[in-house]
């Protein structure tokens, strides 16, 4: 890109730039579903055909005095990380965030405010809903380009993208049923 001529500089170190700067590890983390938070909590990010589901878990995050305080602290930290991950992973479309349930309505509003604040620097068009009584927040984010997962991964030919393959027992039963079906179709063989 000619416009970047003054910005881009040639890498002269013997070590590869991605290894030296730690970018290779960062890129590997972008395709992992789990994102660990500093507090010990974590996010699980699942990108599906219909939507992106983000689950917030407290994990080892128990530094606060009560369950409500732990949930609030983890959710506030998660809101910040969710905004970051949306940009890094180029996640778009319908996004549902399952925050840790909190009893106090003001805490839900604080998490909503934090997420909206963190999303202000995002160039994509975003609509953010409110946290429901189930602890779910719906939002939509404009697709700027294909997500990191879509642009760097291909569908597994074994499971066709489900993430599951048949168990050995299920394979054996499937083979037996198929064999039985074939034998009943061909009357030469006696069962």
Q: Where is each model-derived feature located?
A:
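Conserved glycine-centered short motifs in functionally critical loops
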Residues: 37-191
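Extended, charged alpha/beta regions that create polyanion-binding interfaces
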Residues: 1-48
